[in-house]
């Protein structure tokens, strides 16, 4: 696949229009706002920046890299291992359910394209969204670094759009947040890709608490 087409495929994978339901989740932000932990643009930026460095760089991106390499090597066993590892590191029932629902939605998209149908791969593809993204990126010859940055920006954009509704703040502030927080992504990715297998894993106690409390929050805009 030529580089122009690979770029277009990456934009498709990173698009908020990808039918995986990402816009329906707040990943604990809704409770954090209600609890007063996130009160404005500055505290929102701090909330997201911690996730970039402690979750995205220490868990999601390193696992994405291993899933991608497993796809390139046609190693379904390793792909399944890292898919289960990622799911096990989602710290709450809500976060695990979100991961599985996103993964199942992307797997259905693959079904529609008659891709990823081999039994050795199909069950693992349903477990996580990152698994489907890695599989398609390897299939479409999207370079790993571009895949990771596209995924990171899509995640960040979803969080900022949730912040617009919940904190709230306006579109000017939203674009400034995307500009400023997005500038952290390349260095965080360098850190992520340098980690060994025994260094993987990250957790934020307040995020886990917020997600757990969101499961029973009385009034919610976002899915649990």
Swiss-Prot record:
Required for maturation of urease via the functional incorporation of the urease nickel metallocenter. This is Urease accessory protein UreF. The keyword NADP does not apply. GO terms for molecular function: nickel cation binding. Belongs to the UreF family. UreD, UreF and UreG form a complex that acts as a GTP-hydrolysis-dependent molecular chaperone, activating the urease apoprotein by helping to assemble the nickel containing metallocenter of UreC. The UreE protein probably delivers the nickel. It comes from the Bacteria. GO terms for cellular component: cytoplasm. Pfam families: UreF (PF01730). It comes from Pseudomonas putida (strain ATCC 47054 / DSM 6125 / CFBP 8728 / NCIMB 11950 / KT2440). Keywords: Chaperone, Cytoplasm, Nickel insertion. Coiled coil: none annotated. It is found in: Cytoplasm. Its main location: cytoplasm.
């Amino acid at each position: 696949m030529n580089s122009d087409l690979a770029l277009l495929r990456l934009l498709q994978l990173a698009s908020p229009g990808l039918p995986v339901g990402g816009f329906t989740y707040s990943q604990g932000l809704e409770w954090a706002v209600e609890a007063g932990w996130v009160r404005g643009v500055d505290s929102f930026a701090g909330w997201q920046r911690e996730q970039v460095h402690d979750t995205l760089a220490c868990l999601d991106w390193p696992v994405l890299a291993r899933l991608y390499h497993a796809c390139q090597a046609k190693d379904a066993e390793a792909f399944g291992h890292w898919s289960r590892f990622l799911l096990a590191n989602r710290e709450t029932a809500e976060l695990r359910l979100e991961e599985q629902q996103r993964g199942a939605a992307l797997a259905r998209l693959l079904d529609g394209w008659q891709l990823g149908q081999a039994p050795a791969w199909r069950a693992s593809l349903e477990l996580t969204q990152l698994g489907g993204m890695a599989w398609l990126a390897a299939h479409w010859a999207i370079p790993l670094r571009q895949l990771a940055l596209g995924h990171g920006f899509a995640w960040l954009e979803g969080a900022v759009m949730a912040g617009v509704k919940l904190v709230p703040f306006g579109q000017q502030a939203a674009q400034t947040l995307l500009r400023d927080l997005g500038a952290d992504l390349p260095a965080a990715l360098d850190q992520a890709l340098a980690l060994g297998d025994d260094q993987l894993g990250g957790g934020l106690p307040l995020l886990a608490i917020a997600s757990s409390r969101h499961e029973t929050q009385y009034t919610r805009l976002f899915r649990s």
